[in-house]
């Protein structure tokens, strides 16, 4: 039940962050959070890294091919990171590498998504 509440908060935070952003991005924060839902325990409770988490990270990376999409995904991730006070910052920053995925920015609460290309 607590996981469902956290996921709901993540989705809500993503929608709030993405609401005022007008871009040409095809990615929504709902898509981003849906792909990363399996990562919540790993990022907030120091649980094991589930295979489904890395599948979501890979899928998200494959969807974010344009600069607007990468910037939008970044904004969603920053919003989600800020919504979780128990987020393990080191695990969040290292998540792409742990999943064997290379993204052009660091996942953190303070990433400048406008600089993402």
Swiss-Prot record:
CDD domains listed in its UniProt record: nsLTP1 (cd01960)
Keyword Protein biosynthesis belongs to the record: no
Molecular function terms, GO-annotated: lipid binding
Span of the signal peptide: 1-25
Entry-linked InterPro entries: Bifun_inhib/LTP/seed_sf, Bifunc_inhib/LTP/seed_store, Plant_nsLTP
Swiss-Prot/TrEMBL keywords: Disulfide bond, Lipid-binding, Signal, Transport
One of the GO BP terms on file: lipid transport
Record bears the keyword Metal-binding: no
Disulphide bond pairs: 29-76, 39-53, 54-99, 74-113
Purpose: Plant non-specific lipid-transfer proteins transfer phospholipids as well as galactolipids across membranes. May play a role in wax or cutin deposition in the cell walls of expanding epidermal cells and certain secretory tissues.
Assigned protein family: Belongs to the plant LTP family.
Name the UniProt record assigns to this protein: Non-specific lipid-transfer protein 1
Organism: Brassica napus (Rape)
């Amino acid at each position: 039940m607590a996981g469902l509440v956290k996921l709901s908060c993540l989705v809500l935070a993503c929608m709030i962050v993405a609401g005022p952003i007008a871009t040409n991005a095809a990615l929504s924060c709902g898509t981003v959070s849906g792909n990363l839902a399996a990562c919540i325990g790993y990022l907030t409770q120091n649980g094991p890294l589930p295979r489904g988490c890395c599948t979501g990270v890979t899928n998200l990376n494959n969807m974010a091919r344009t600069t607007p999409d990468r910037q939008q995904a970044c904004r969603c991730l920053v919003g989600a990171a800020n919504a979780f006070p128990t987020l393990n910052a080191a695990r969040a920053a290292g998540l792409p590498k742990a999943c064997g995925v290379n993204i052009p920015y660091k996942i953190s609460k303070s990433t400048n998504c406008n600089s993402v290309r």
